[in-house]
Amino acid sequence: MQGTWFSLFVVVMVSHLACGGECSFGSHLADMAGLSGRHDKERHQAKKRYYHSMYGNQTPYPYANGQQASPPPQGQLLIIQNPDGSFMIVDQQGVPQVPQAAGGPGSPMNGGYYMPTGVYTAQVVPGTPGHPVQAIPQQPLRTQATATYYHPAAVPPPGPSVFVFTPSSVQPGAEVTPGYSGLQLRQQSQYGYSYPGTTSTPTPPPPASYGYPVFPAFPRLPAFSDSVSVSTEDSGLTGVKDSSSSESTVTPADEAASESEEGDKTSRKSKVKKGILTGLGVAATLAAAAAAAKAVKGFGGTRTSTAPAEAGKTELDDGYRPPPFNPRPSPYAELLKDLERMRKE
């Protein structure tokens, strides 16, 4: 039996070699032998390059042409103060150019990168420190910039300001690494920080050019006049405080007038209080009398009628009213007659 299987295997191999290895079974044996491994490797490398081009080079910076590309190694985070006193944060990736001199068309930076001048807007979320601040350029520049940063949690906003980034440990022109605890950066590269008043800060446009106010509007306090009238209800004194003097002047005549006025107010209040109490007492007496009369009537008391319309009523009209949906005589009619007869006797 073993000889038969061996002879069959020899016949199959000879037929495969005779047809040049084009048979399906022969090609399977060739694949097992590694003859087509080079083709599979090339196809795998092509797939790898294709998927890497789709998913392997993603950056958080979208460019104008819709393609994703690696940003320059350095950028600049501008902190611009508006003429109205508000702040906004603008992040812009630098363009590889020759460093410009002070007052040139761009903003000089370390490493030959500079900030193109332009108009910027800032989307600021009002609230406590920790809310995001997103800076978006108002018009397309040579490079697009869209970055989200956060308020420094260690620096609370003073007054009505939404956020202020002026840490004491950072000086104008200094570089801050992403490990700084006062600000959370998304990129793992150093950023140059520009402050208002330096050569690297572009001149911001007037506040009217922004789409909306960065800070909420707060009502202003009314202006104080030179003399303010101060009234004290506890002591009944009224003095005039002048802006030049720090004390109020009260004369004895004013004290006597205030005391007499206070006495008049007290007597007036007592009279009103007595009148109210008297009215309440009369109302309570009338209510009690009405309740007593109603109770007597309910227990069968005599009923005196003054209305002329009650003259034509029947003798059974002693406060009893049959329901309108049941006009038949009540079963208690006989009892009422007996009570009326007993009352007359």
Swiss-Prot record:
Residues 321-330 have a biased composition (Pro residues). Residues 227-271, 298-345 are annotated as: Disordered. The keyword Acetylation does not apply. Residues 335-345 have a biased composition (Basic and acidic residues). Residues 1-20 form the signal peptide. The keyword NAD does not apply. One of its GO terms (cellular component) is transport vesicle. Keywords: Cytoplasmic vesicle, Glycoprotein, Membrane, Secreted, Signal, Transmembrane, Transmembrane helix. This is Dense granule protein 4. O-glycosylated. The chain crosses the membrane at residues 276-296. It is found in: Secreted; Parasitophorous vacuole lumen; Parasitophorous vacuole membrane; Cytoplasmic vesicle, Secretory vesicle. Residues 227-251 have a biased composition (Polar residues). Major granular component involved in excreted-secreted antigen (ESA) immunity.
